Amino acid sequence: MARAAVRAGAKVALIDRDGACAEKAAAEIGAAAWGVGADVTDEAAIAAAMAGAERALGPLTGLVNNAGIAGFGSVHTTEVETWGRIMAVNVTGTFLASKAALSGMLERRRGAIVNFGSVAGLVGIPSMAAYCAAKGAVVSLTRQMAAEYSGQGIRVNVVCPGTVASTDMGRQLLGQDADPELEARRLAKYPIGRFGTPEDIAEAAIFLLSTKAAFVTGCVFAVDGGMTAI
């Protein structure tokens, strides 16, 4: 995602709970990137990280909220602690990062926010109660933000990826041991005949951040190989 943004001409701030990881990734990208550690569920930490990014790179014009965690469990089996953790990272994290970014965007009357949902926020997936609920909340929050802020120069959209097999999330969904039968069953749900790639998802987000999407706001952008079409 960050590399795609830099290729498009942007400067990027990478914020991760693991500060060393964020700094290492930024160093690998080069001078156009800056990395810092912050927990998206900590309001003070994420606000400080945003302020640091603006000092390092200049005014914030785009935000990608792609911090997220998944988990497995039905309503009757999910522990309250698991439910709370999934909601905190996926929903509260999106809220807090957006809140931190919006003050400057509103002052400048310019900005684009891309939230990350999931096909799990659009359709029901067995044994993923908390994750489906969290990503559904992100979709609804995106629509609310678009309705409220688009007239003030700030567009808000949500990308809802299908399975991306090469990511940690994709490996969770397919099983750590890449069960061929499970993979085949999941693949059968994708009319395009393959799972997504990180590049597929990144290019969708970069489009929504760009001026090419100047008339796009409140959009639920399913990047899912047709999964939700059937």
Swiss-Prot record:
GO terms for biological process: fatty acid elongation. The keyword Translocase does not apply. Keywords: Plasmid. GO terms for molecular function: oxidoreductase activity, acting on the CH-OH group of donors, NAD or NADP as acceptor. It comes from the Bacteria. Gene3D superfamilies: NAD(P)-binding Rossmann-like Domain. Belongs to the short-chain dehydrogenases/reductases (SDR) family. This is Inactive 2-(S)-hydroxypropyl-CoM dehydrogenase 2. It comes from Xanthobacter autotrophicus (strain ATCC BAA-1158 / Py2).
